[in-house]
Amino acid sequence: TEAVVHRLPDLRSVESFINKKVPVVVSVAFKKGELSGAPISSTPGHLLVVRGFTKTGQVIVNDPAGKTNSQVRRIYDRAQFERAWLRGSGGIAYVIAPTSMGLTF
């Protein structure tokens, strides 16, 4: 297994990993009202697992701030999420994948 912490430029880069069945952990930060549907109102830093995208491009995550298992899976607005990620951490992403995939950045 290979693991890297890397800055990615946008959600399209995350999508390329998701399309290869590789989830990506991202660090987000947001103020009240900046990420609709989040289980916390604001945060200076919070890790989420991006696990997919809807047909319309919204971001499907596992958010550990959900109070119950059924509240962990969330779908966030793509533009709001990308802003919270890029402004919050500069695009920091944690990628863990089998070495055989030959991750390149």
Question: Language-model segments: which ranges?
Answer:
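Noncatalytic regulatory segments and standalone regulatory/sensor domains
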Residues: 41-42, 53-105
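Active-site-adjacent substructure of cysteine-protease-like catalytic cores
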Residues: 7-66, 104
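Helix-adjacent hinge/juxtasegments
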Residues: 2-5
